[in-house]
């Protein structure tokens, strides 16, 4: 949907194209343990609804709805792990490290958040709302709206629990960006966590080449 961010560059572009007011208050929302709290059956239903109701599948595959459901269930529900010599099966949620994790998280939240925002009272609805997987950046017309909006969001789905961080001294970090507000002006710079050491694996180390070249591209874009 329109609220989903592709990357940091997309976030900066959207933010700088937004008409910032001097009274706007910045905050970020985070979904607690999103991947392990994704309801798989509900999310699979959402996937099938979007694929088959919009007839997307017929353009690329001859699979039936039942066959597609079976494939999705095999990909995300047959997850086992070994702990203290015992084998366990994960009953719900996306397993950590599953490549489908970010995809299913985006599908689930994208399906719900537009409706949640429409149902939210206009009195404390955010003026600006964008999300990257489980991290959301919002702008309110008053700082008191943040707690009200957080309470509203925490009532929407039993699996989704949101925490928030408010701006401090007109500054807020989101993803790897430090956002600073001065009047109706916004400036951005690179944000580094206090634990950042600046150390990276050697280029000659044994690892996928796409990860190494991806890191170089990312650093070039940042600077």
What does each of the following model-derived ranges do?
Residues 1-223:
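Charged structural interfaces that engage phosphate-rich ligands
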């Amino acid at each position: 949907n329109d609220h989903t961010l592709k990357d940091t560059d997309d976030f900066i572009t959207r933010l700088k194209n937004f008409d910032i007011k001097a009274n706007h208050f910045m905050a970020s929302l985070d979904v607690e343990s999103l991947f392990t709290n994704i309801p798989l059956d509900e999310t699979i239903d959402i996937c099938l609804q979007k694929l088959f109701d919009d007839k997307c599948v017929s353009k690329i595959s001859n699979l039936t709805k039942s066959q597609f459901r079976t494939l999705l269930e095999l990909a995300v529900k047959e997850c086992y792990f070994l702990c203290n010599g015992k084998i366990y099966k994960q009953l719900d949620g996306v397993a950590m490290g599953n490549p489908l994790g970010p995809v299913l998280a985006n599908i689930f939240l994208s399906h719900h958040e537009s409706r949640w925002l429409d149902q939210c009272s206009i009195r404390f609805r955010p003026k600006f709302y964008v999300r990257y997987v489980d991290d959301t950046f919002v702008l309110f017309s008053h700082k008191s709206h943040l707690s009200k909006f957080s309470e509203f969001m925490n009532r929407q789905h039993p699996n989704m629990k949101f925490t928030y961080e408010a701006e401090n001294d007109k500054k807020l970090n989101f993803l790897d960006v430090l956002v600073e507000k001065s009047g109706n002006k916004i400036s951005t710079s690179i944000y580094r966590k206090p634990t950042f050491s600046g150390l990276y694996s050697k280029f000659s180390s044994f690892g996928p080449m796409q990860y190494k070249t991806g890191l170089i591209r990312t650093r070039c874009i940042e600077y």
